[in-house]
Amino acid sequence: MSVDAAVVKNEDKYIPTIDLRDYFDAYSEEKRAKVIEQVRKACLEHGFFQVEGHGVPVESQRRMFAACKALFDLPLEKKRRISLYKYSWRRGYEGPGEQQANDPHHGDFERDAKEGFFVGKELPLDQVDFGKGPNVWPPDLAENDFHRPVMEYYEHARKVGFKVMELLAVSLGHPPSILKDFTTDAAMFLKLLRYPAHTWTDTRKFGSGQHTDYGGITILLQDPGQDGLEVWHEATQQWVELPALEDKFVINLGDMVQRWTGGKYKSTLHRVINKTGGERYAVPAFWHGDLDAKNPLDPNDTSDETVLEFIKKKFYKGYGLTDDTSL
């Protein structure tokens, strides 16, 4: 893999678009079988595909981006008051340079230029653990401008996660019922992102450095027209640009799914280079399933590592955290 390898446009040639309606709304077994095969092929080759027909209203997507812009337009000192470093369950604001998405074995790169903000399922303080607890809401934003549109979108994205997880299971030859316990109390972390314009000359610095996602399924919403996501295509040794299109989500598999499938399904390198000349917004939803589960896709796996243990280890590494880290 080379940071300077050629960059090509996707045009559905490398990373396919799959219509979820052909599986979930179809009465044709032929259509359902075709979707299952499309998912299987994409996961075997590079672990990335795009989806349409997902059921998330366009208006909810647009309100989500309006909320993003309202948040990140706040003065930096106000955003830092709700820093994720202040809360052991790690909700809230991430400033520029606070995360290094890139793992050192992928190369020597600077920390990410982006800003972020984590949201999750609302839980009371007496249930606090890593990834579990109350959300942290910016006090300067009205509920209708931020809290409500964000949580409305959160619930929509969570439902997409259930659909994609079912497709992964059936594409591996399992019945959907294998996920019954895994999806009962499924965890998902939503992350609002803002990337600055890529105006620097340092070749080791990116909006988000090349990395693989470490968890389960990522459901990425991109602000239409704000391109920047590039996916490494191993077979052709080049970067593939995935355009930001309205009402089309990018799905990719994380390291946890790759481990669960014994390396059969791929977790693939990707990066963000914001060439728009302005700010770029995106909202990934990291859908992990039951945090106390082990391997829902292989009942014969004898590993004792839980979802929570796996993602906590990876998260802490990216942010330079320990259980005691705080500002």
From Swiss-Prot:
Fe cation binds at residues 211, 213, 270. Pathway: Secondary metabolite biosynthesis. Its cofactor is Fe(2+). GO terms for biological process: small molecule biosynthetic process. Its EC number is 1.14.-.-. One of its GO terms (molecular function) is metal ion binding. Disruption phenotype: Abolished the production of penilactone A, peniphenone D and terrestric acid. Belongs to the iron/ascorbate-dependent oxidoreductase family. 2-oxoglutarate-dependent dioxygenase; part of the tra gene cluster that produces terrestric acid. The clavatol biosynthesis cluster cla and the terrestric acid cluster tra are both involved in the production of peniphenones and penilactones. The non-reducing PKS claF is responsible for the formation of clavatol from successive condensations of 3 malonyl-CoA units, presumably with a simple acetyl-CoA starter unit, and 2 methylation steps. The esterase claE probably collaborates with claF by catalyzing the hydrolysis of ACP-bound acyl intermediates to free the ACP from stalled intermediates. PANTHER family: 2-OXOGLUTARATE (2OG) AND FE(II)-DEPENDENT OXYGENASE SUPERFAMILY PROTEIN-RELATED. This is 2-oxoglutarate-dependent dioxygenase traH. It comes from Penicillium crustosum (Blue mold fungus).
